[in-house]
Amino acid sequence: MQTQRASLSLGRWSLWLLLLGLVVPSASAQALSYREAVLRAVDQLNELSSEANLYRLLELDPPPKDNEDLGTRKPVSFTVKETVCPRTIQQPAEQCDFKEKGRVKQCVGTVTLDPSNDQFDLNCNELQSVILPWKWPWWPWRRG
């Protein structure tokens, strides 16, 4: 009697493991969206950064119009902005407010949509604000 119960229990566990094995690969094979892939790249940039504060996605250019092949590198272009959260904090950058007058960086490169592949190739450069010299308008003192 005891042997039959143990055998039945083992059979149930085997069935559960089989079902779990069928479900897990299909879940991991789903491609990341273009935005999700970029957000993962921003997270990696924050981890590798030596700057004091985290950066957060500010603007994302439209995705390329090509196939959804997981392994293919996709070109990306986006801007990130410095947040008020220190880099040492264990908080997602998406939950941090942008820093007033924080640095803004333009990033270009490639990412993959494969959730098991965190490889990306990005180059981010700080955008410099352009200050135009203000001149007095000439028209009020126009001579006729």
Swiss-Prot record:
GO biological process: antimicrobial humoral immune response mediated by antimicrobial peptide; defense response to fungus; defense response to Gram-negative bacterium; defense response to Gram-positive bacterium; innate immune response; killing of cells of another organism
Alphabetical list of Pfam families matching this protein: Cathelicidins
Propeptide: 30-130
PTM text: Elastase might be responsible for its maturation.
Protein origin, superkingdom: Eukaryota
Main location: secreted
Compartments where located: Secreted
Keywords: Amidation, Antibiotic, Antimicrobial, Disulfide bond, Fungicide, Secreted, Signal
Modified residues (Arginine amide): R143
GO cellular component, one term: extracellular space
Tissue expression per record: Large granules of neutrophils.
InterPro entries cross-referenced by the UniProt entry: Cathelicidin-like, Cathelicidin_CS, Cystatin_sf
An example Gene Ontology molecular-function term: lipopolysaccharide binding
Disulfide bond sites: C85-C96, C107-C124
Family: Belongs to the cathelicidin family.
Job of this protein: Potent microbicidal activity; active against S.aureus and E.coli.
Name listed for the protein in its UniProt record: Cathelicidin-4
Taxonomic classification: Eukaryota, Metazoa, Chordata, Craniata, Vertebrata
